[in-house]
UniProtKB/Swiss-Prot annotation:
Keywords: Aminoacyl-tRNA synthetase, ATP-binding, Cytoplasm, Ligase, Magnesium, Metal-binding, Nucleotide-binding, Protein biosynthesis
Reaction it catalyzes: tRNA(Lys) + L-lysine + ATP = L-lysyl-tRNA(Lys) + AMP + diphosphate
Name of the molecule in the record: Lysine--tRNA ligase
Lineage: Bacteria, Bacillati, Bacillota, Bacilli, Bacillales
Organism expressing this protein natively: Listeria monocytogenes serovar 1/2a (strain ATCC BAA-679 / EGD-e)
Gene name as annotated: lysS
The keyword Nucleotide-binding is assigned to this record: yes
GO BP terms in the entry: lysyl-tRNA aminoacylation
Subunit field text: Homodimer.
Length: 498
């Protein structure tokens, strides 16, 4: 094992290794070859559930099954074991005179956790349990370590994350959650494809970290002798494709942000981003509403779900509210009538909202929203009209240029989507990038950098475009009632063990 040098072998580990030696001395490979299965334990449960003991005896149906030993008891020349394939268990009845003396000796050496192959016939025991009467027994893989207690699984949450393979063996809820994650991704792709979007792939390594306000991971390309960044968003390359005439595109991929971890944040996570030419942010609201409600219905059978203590109804039509109206409703502060940065700062001071040097009217409105409103939005709510200062890639609102045609979707007090009518004016975009650069000089290290290549692409003409970003991990958390992002990532980023 990989960490044998760092631990002393306890009695169980020693005994299991001695059994490996014994098997090899008898000419038996403890780590076997390919084994062809004709049926799974789950299929046996489904296909033969209504068959009586007599019907099964008469049919004498021969099968080939495999799985991990979860229980085992031996009495003389007879033994019983339950094997597990995923989370479906099947009882195996083993007689020495049926499988032969040599194979029975191997069975007696088997431990919980070993993976075995069985050939035999299906029957029903006197207690009514569907089982397989073995005629052949094959050891496929010897387990050198004992499994966690089968009745209690892994109680140490951190161990579940570090050793996900053990969690999947012992925790049916965890395994089902990852099956649901896979289905959510499939149904998401199906929905986007059916809406006429084309799935594409764009670079993971970027020359400029753009498309979001976040700290990047930095790497170095030796052959080109240049710094590169793991992407913090998918946006800017996808918009280039819209310029190139690919009218509706989407990508589901990993993005990387060199920031802290929490129950909602992991340094690498999965995003869906989509862009549709000749549409705006209101069209994207309709897309998101349809996507989330449809996928929820497909995986849960309903659009009414439970997340933690909350009952959430994802049935369209969802609430839509301007950010300034939301702050007015929940805080009682009317930012529509705030006319200067100084006035906004005074309001922030009065209401204990943190303000830093670079912040202006729009930043402060957003701080009010994040401090007092966001966590109160339990039912699905589109909050639109984000200030221009925090939306460098979004189109200004024609009626009030302090704001943009942008929205975020909030459910159970968390952001689940971010979208806007894309800024397609290259002159305005350059000015926004320059403003972001000034913020960076004033201490905002998450401000957007200048991307000259993207600006050049815009100068060829980006049609009016509706763009969307959805955090797939948060969506999976919501639809599977997972309290932490680590519960829906197979291998979350973890700190080194001491």
């Amino acid at each position: 094992m990989s960490n044998e040098n760092h631990e002393e072998l306890n009695d169980q580990l020693i005994v299991r290794r001695e059994k490996v030696d014994t098997l090899r001395e008898e000419g038996i490979d403890p780590f076997g070859e390919k084994f062809i299965r004709s049926i799974s334990p789950e299929e046996i449960e489904t296909k033969f559930a209504d068959k009586s003991k007599e019907e099964l005896e008469e049919a004498a149906i021969e099968v080939s099954v495999a799985g991990r030993i979860m229980t085992k008891r031996v009495k003389g020349k007879v033994g019983f074991t339950h094997i597990q394939d995923r989370f479906h268990q099947l009882q195996i009845y083993i007689r020495k005179d049926a499988i032969g003396e040599d194979a029975y000796a191997v069975f007696k050496l088997a431990d919980l956790g070993d993976i075995i192959g069985i050939k035999g016939t299906i029957f029903r025991t006197n207690t009514g349990e569907l089982s397989v009467k073995a005629t052949e027994f094959t050891l496929l893989s010897k387990s050198l370590r004992p499994l966690p207690d089968k009745y209690h699984g892994l109680k140490d949450v951190e161990q579940r994350y570090r050793q996900r393979y053990l969690d999947l063996i012992t925790n049916e809820e965890s395994q089902n959650r990852f099956v649901m994650r896979s289905k959510i991704l499939k149904y998401t792709r199906d929905y986007m494809d059916n809406q006429g979007f084309l799935e594409v792939e764009t670079p993971v390594l970027h020359t400029i970290a753009g498309g979001a306000a976040a700290k990047p991971f930095i790497t170095h390309h030796n052959a080109l002798d240049m710094e590169l960044y793991l992407r913090i968003a998918l946006e800017l390359h996808l918009k280039r494709l819209i310029v190139g005439g690919m009218d509706k595109v989407y990508e589901i991929g990993r993005v990387f942000r060199n920031e802290g971890t929490s129950t909602r944040h992991n340094p690498e996570f999965t995003m869906l981003e989509s862009y549709a030419a000749y549409e705006d942010y209101e069209d994207v609201m309709d897309l998101v509403e349809g996507l989330v409600s449809t996928v929820c219905k497909q995986v849960n059978g309903t659009t009414e779900i439970t997340y933690g203590e909350y009952k959430v109804d994802l049935t369209p039509n969802w609430r839509r509210i301007h950010m300034a109206d939301a702050v007015k409703e929940y805080v009682g502060v009317d930012f529509w009538n705030v006319t200067s940065d100084e006035e906004a700062r005074e309001l922030a001071k009065k209401h204990d909202v943190p303000v830093t040097e670079h912040m202006t009217y729009g930043h402060i409105l957003n701080e009010f929203f994040e401090t007092y409103v966001e966590e109160k939005l339990i039912q699905p709510t589109f909050v639109y009209g984000h200030p221009v200062e925090i939306s460098p890639l979004a189109k200004k609102n024609k009626e009030d240029e302090r704001f943009t045609d942008r929205f975020e979707l909030f459910i159970v007090g968390r952001e689940h989507a971010n979208a806007f009518s894309e800024l397609n004016d290259p002159i305005d975009q350059r000015e926004r990038f320059e403003a972001q650069m000034k913020e960076r000089e004033q201490g905002n290290d998450e401000a957007h950098g200048m991307d000259a290549d993207f600006l050049e692409a815009l100068e060829y003409g980006l049609p009016p475009t509706g763009g969307l970003g959805i955090g797939i991990d948060r969506l999976v958390m919501l639809l599977t009632d997972a309290p932490s992002i680590r519960d829906i990532l197979l291998f979350p980023t973890m700190k080194h063990r001491d």
